[in-house]
Amino acid sequence: KVLHTPGHTLGGCCYYDEADSCCFCGDTIFNGSVGRTDFYSGSARALIDSIQKRIFTLPPDTKLYPGHNEKTTVAYEMKYNPCCR
C-alpha cells in the first residue's frame, strides 16, 4: 500500500506491506530521527503530520525500514523519537 507522506519532499511516499508488517520509509523517518525538510518542497510541519497520521497509525509492531541506518518499529519511534514528540 502506498502512503503519501509529504514533508521531506512534496512527493514523499512510504510503502506498507501489511502481510509482512513492514514499511519502507525512505527519508520520512529514521531510527531516532526524521528526514531533512530544507529542500525546495520540504516542510517540517507536513513531515510531522505525515508521520503522525500515516506512520504512527500503523500497528505498533510494524517494522520500519528507513533509507539510512538501522531498522526500527512504529512502537519504538512513538516512544523514543525526539523529533516526533
Which stretches of residues belong to each language-model region?
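Metallo-beta-lactamase
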Residues: 4, 9-85
